[in-house]
């Protein structure tokens, strides 16, 4: 599979604190890449660098190169980045008691004012995304009335309507019970997109990811298939 994303010698410091230290890896088109490691290892920080969300952090010192389709990430506009990356952050509460349709519509590109009239094409796009995540029946329900697994599927549907080629998820199964953890990851890995996600549960990482990056203290300890990374020898040193 050809590389879609390339990270070379990436380091990130904020003031005098090292967040990431000399990380290099590639992501192939269509790959499901899991990022694992203990709390504070730099997993979410790495996602922020990949998606160019850390450029305005105070005290920021960033070195190395991130390229997307052979183009340096800093050369992309915010609009172009949204066309390439769809981000599902760790589960957050809705600011307003919006219904499912309104939340999913927030993913439309270009962004539209909330409660504005959507075109027929937009409505079809939203309906298709909800169908993919199995929530066609819930479009008028309040987000806050849904289960944790259903809420996460709504956020994935919102990402899908962007039409981006890379789905980036930060702990997509956080705070979900075992049934919904598997439901979400089966969904994510069936979408035929390039997927980059942080994963806390090593069993889930082994089952659903093509490849794993093991981080510790901001450094890349191991990069490879789950059977290479998830060894007792490696994990005992973390």
Model-derived regions: residue spans:
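The feature captures the beta-strand-to-loop junction immediately N-terminal to the Walker
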Residues: 36-38
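Conserved ABC ATPase "signature" C-loop
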Residues: 217-218
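Helix-to-loop junction immediately C-terminal to a conserved catalytic motif
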Residues: 51
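Conserved ABC ATPase signature
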Residues: 142-146, 150
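ABC ATPase NBD Q-loop/coupling interface
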Residues: 65-80
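Conserved ABC ATPase "signature" region
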Residues: 105, 120-138
